[in-house]
C-alpha cells in the first residue's frame, strides 16, 4: 500500500526553482531571453510585455477552473478570479469605449471563430480582405475553418497603388449580398475607412466585423481611428500593439449581440477560461489606460514612418508607398530577392522579421517576394526615430550584400551588422 508520504508531491514541489526542477526548459527560456535582449525584433505581431504582465500570467490563477462568467460559474471558489475577470472586462470597455467585452478568447483565431459561430450558419457568405492583399487566415482562407465551413468572398487592393478600392467593395457586396463583412488584416499598412465599411454593410443587410488585432494598441493610444462606433462586433488580440499577453478580446456596442457572443465563447468553443491570462490581460489594459501609453502609440507610428522612409532612401520599394500604422511591407522584387532568403539573412544579423507575401505576389507563401517589418517591440524597449533610421540602414546593408552574393561578402556583412545590433540593443536593455 502506498503511503501518504510517497503518494504526495515531492518535498521540493513548492520550493524548487525552474533551474532545479527542469534545467532543460530553464535553459531554453534563458536562451530565448538572450535572443530577445540582443536582437532587434521587427515582427509586427510581436511585442515585449511588462514584468507585471509576466508576473500575473505566471501566478496561482493558473490553478483555477472557472467555467462560465463572473457571478455565474460552474465551480465554487471563484471569488478572486471573478475579481480579476471583472477588472479585465471593465478596463477593456473603458479603454475602447465599448458597452460589452468578452475577455475569455484564448487566441485571435478563437475570437473570430466565436463571432462566426454567433452570427453565421455553415454555408453563409461573408467577405474579407484577401490574404495575399494583407488579410488573415481567419478571414476566409481556404485552408482555414472560415474558408471551409463558410462561403468566403474576398475583396482586394488596387494593383496600381495597393490600397483597398472601396467602390469595388461596395459593388462586390451588392452582387453577392454577404451576411457578414470583415474589415481588418495582418499586413495592410493603410488606414481603414470604418464609416464606409459600415455604410456598405448596412446597404446589403450585413453585419460588420472589424478585426483590429494588429492596430488595437494604436486605437487605445488615440493615434488610429476606432472601429468600435461603427462595427457590430470588434475583435482584437491582446498582444501585438496592445502589449499584453497572448489572447483575444471581443467588443460590441450592440446589446442584442452580447448574449450570442458570450454563448459562442462558452459553451460554444471553449471550456474553462485561462484565468492567469485573463489576469494578465487586466494588467495590460490598465497599463494602456495610462497617459504614457498614448506616447508609446504615437512613437510606434512615427517610428514606422521613419523606418519606411529609411528603406525607401536605400532604394527599396514599400507596398502602397508607406504606412499609416505600425507595419510596412517591403517589395524585394526590384532587388531580385526572395522573402525567405532575406528573412534568414537578417536573422543571422540579429534582426528578426518575417517573409510575407505582397499583393499579386507571384511567389509561393513559403518563398514570397516581400518582408513585413513592424515597430511595436523595438519601440517598447525605447527605440526612437534615430534608431529606426539606423536599423533601416542595417537592413539595407544585409539585403544588398545577399543581392550581390557572388562576391562572397554577405557573411562578413551579416557578422558586422550583428555586432552593431548588439551594441544598439545594449543601450536599450530589457528585463534587467
Curated annotation (Swiss-Prot):
| Cofactors required | pyridoxal 5'-phosphate
Q: What is its EC number?
A: 2.1.2.1
Q: Which enzyme class? A: transferase
Localization annotation: Cytoplasm
Gene3D superfamilies given for it? Aspartate Aminotransferase, domain 1 (3.90.1150.10), Type I PLP-dependent aspartate aminotransferase-like (Major domain) (3.40.640.10)
- State the reactions this protein catalyses: (6R)-5,10-methylene-5,6,7,8-tetrahydrofolate + glycine + H2O = (6S)-5,6,7,8-tetrahydrofolate + L-serine
Q: What keyword terms does UniProt attach to this protein?
A: Amino-acid biosynthesis, Cytoplasm, One-carbon metabolism, Pyridoxal phosphate, Transferase
Disulfide bond entries: none
Q: Where does (6S)-5,6,7,8-tetrahydrofolate bind?
A: 131, 135-137
List residues, modification N6-(pyridoxal phosphate)lysine. 240
* Listed GO biological process terms: glycine biosynthetic process from serine; tetrahydrofolate interconversion; tetrahydrofolate metabolic process
Site feature location: Plays an important role in substrate specificity: 239
- Keyword Membrane on this protein? no
Gene Ontology annotations for the cellular component aspect, listed alphabetically: cytoplasm; cytosol
Classification via InterPro entries: PyrdxlP-dep_Trfase, PyrdxlP-dep_Trfase_major, PyrdxlP-dep_Trfase_small, Ser_HO-MeTrfase, Ser_HO-MeTrfase-like, Ser_HO-MeTrfase_PLP_BS, SHMT-like_dom
What role does this protein play? Catalyzes the reversible interconversion of serine and glycine with tetrahydrofolate (THF) serving as the one-carbon carrier. This reaction serves as the major source of one-carbon groups required for the biosynthesis of purines, thymidylate, methionine, and other important biomolecules. Also exhibits THF-independent aldolase activity toward beta-hydroxyamino acids, producing glycine and aldehydes, via a retro-aldol mechanism.
Family membership noted in the UniProt record: Belongs to the SHMT family.
Please describe the quaternary structure of this protein. Homodimer.
Protein's recorded name: Serine hydroxymethyltransferase
Q: Which organism is it from?
A: Bradyrhizobium diazoefficiens (strain JCM 10833 / BCRC 13528 / IAM 13628 / NBRC 14792 / USDA 110)
What gene, per UniProt, encodes this protein? Answer: glyA
Amino acid at each position: 500500500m502506498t503511503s501518504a508520504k510517497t503518494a504526495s508531491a515531492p518535498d521540493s514541489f513548492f520550493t524548487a526553482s525552474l533551474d532545479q526542477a527542469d534545467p532543460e526548459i530553464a535553459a531554453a527560456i534563458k536562451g530565448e531571453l538572450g535572443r530577445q535582449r540582443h536582437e532587434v525584433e521587427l515582427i509586427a505581431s510581436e511585442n515585449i510585455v511588462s514584468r507585471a504582465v509576466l508576473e500575473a500570467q505566471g501566478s496561482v490563477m493558473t490553478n483555477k477552473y472557472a467555467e462560465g462568467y463572473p457571478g455565474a460559474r460552474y465551480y465554487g471558489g471563484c471569488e478572486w478570479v471573478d475579481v480579476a475577470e471583472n477588472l479585465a472586462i471593465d478596463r477593456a470597455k473603458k479603454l475602447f469605449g465599448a458597452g460589452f467585452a468578452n475577455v475569455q478568447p484564448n487566441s485571435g483565431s478563437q475570437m473570430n471563430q466565436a463571432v462566426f459561430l454567433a452570427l453565421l450558419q455553415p454555408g453563409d457568405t461573408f467577405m474579407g480582405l484577401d490574404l495575399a492583399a494583407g488579410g488573415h487566415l481567419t478571414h476566409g482562407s481556404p485552408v482555414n475553418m472560415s474558408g471551409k465551413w463558410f462561403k468566403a468572398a474576398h475583396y482586394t487592393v488596387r494593383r496600381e497603388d495597393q490600397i483597398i478600392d472601396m467602390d469595388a467593395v461596395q459593388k462586390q457586396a451588392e452582387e453577392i449580398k454577404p451576411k457578414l463583412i470583415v474589415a481588418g488584416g495582418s499586413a495592410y499598412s493603410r488606414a481603414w475607412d470604418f464609416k464606409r465599411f459600415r455604410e456598405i454593410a448596412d446597404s446589403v443587410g450585413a453585419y460588420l466585423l472589424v478585426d483590429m488585432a494588429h492596430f488595437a494598441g494604436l486605437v487605445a493610444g488615440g493615434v488610429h481611428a476606432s472601429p468600435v462606433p461603427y462595427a457590430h462586433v470588434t475583435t482584437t488580440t491582446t498582444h501585438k500593439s496592445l502589449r499584453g499577453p497572448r489572447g483575444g478580446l471581443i467588443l460590441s456596442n450592440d446589446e442584442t449581440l452580447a448574449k450570442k457572443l458570450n454563448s459562442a465563447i462558452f459553451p460554444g468553443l471553449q471550456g474553462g477560461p485561462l484565468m492567469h491570462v485573463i489576469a494578465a490581460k487586466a494588467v495590460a489594459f490598465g497599463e494602456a489606460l495610462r497617459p504614457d501609453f498614448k506616447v508609446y502609440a504615437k512613437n510606434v507610428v512615427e517610428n514606422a514612418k521613419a523606418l519606411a522612409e529609411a528603406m525607401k532612401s536605400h532604394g527599396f520599394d514599400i507596398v502602397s508607398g508607406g504606412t499609416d500604422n505600425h507595419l510596412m511591407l517591403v517589395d524585394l522584387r526590384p532587388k531580385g530577392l526572395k522573402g525567405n532568403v532575406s528573412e534568414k539573412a537578417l536573422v543571422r544579423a540579429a534582426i528578426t522579421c518575417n517573409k510575407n507575401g505582397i499583393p499579386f505576389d507571384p511567389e509561393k507563401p513559403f518563398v514570397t517576394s516581400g518582408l513585413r517589418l513592424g515597430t511595436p517591440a523595438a519601440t517598447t524597449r525605447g527605440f526612437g526615430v534615430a534608431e529606426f533610421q539606423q536599423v533601416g540602414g542595417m537592413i539595407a546593408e544585409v539585403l544588398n550584400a545577399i543581392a550581390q552574393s557572388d562576391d562572397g561578402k554577405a557573411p562578413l556583412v551579416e557578422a558586422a551588422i550583428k555586432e552593431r545590433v548588439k551594441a544598439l540593443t545594449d543601450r536599450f536593455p530589457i528585463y534587467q
